[in-house]
Amino acid sequence: MSNYLKTRYSEDKRPHTSYPAELVNYLFQRFNLKPSMKLLEPGVGRGEFLREFKKLGLEVVGLDISPEAKDLSPDLHIVIEDSDSIKLPFDDNSFDVIYSKSFIEHLHNPSFFLNEAYRIIKPQGLLITLTPDWEVQYKKFYDDYTHITPFTSVSLEEIQKACGFKDVKVFKFRQLPLLWKYPFLNLLSILISPFVPLRTTNKYLRWSWELMLVSSGVVPKKK
């Protein structure tokens, strides 16, 4: 895994764009998040999403297995730990929100992580997870050699319920901000998607057919 983050998130491969700010603002409104909430992002990468949550007034902490994450985000509080198999270095009921994007599919043991997430989220706190939709992306899911555990909408819902989360909801999601404002345009994406090359490098064409799963789960009052 040496240099994985610096290679995966190089400016050549993934130049900085306005997308993190657009997605974070969408999620902030969609899930009724509030400034001053304490948020943890596992799989923080280069910190671009976490940084946007911080701009909105949340108290943020990042978590990553790679020490490179600290080098990529010296302005953020980043904790280095293997969240796949080791108890997370946080007290019970520490966070209002745990948010992750393109993280849970990298885990050998997602149930272990979700049980830990349940432990450290406060009662009535929220888990927000974004992960590729296996039913749509199975042909190229393993193009990223670090992908391990795929999810469907059913399995993503069931694993969270099994780990104690309540009011679990999962919906399919295209990563095109225009579609969030004008959902009727999803029909156009559906119509053109069969004609988009599987491994197109044009992100707008790619995102017209790639679907993500977005899930949310609430931690109930604990005994």
Where are these regions (language model features)?
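Short alpha-helix
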Residues: 148-163
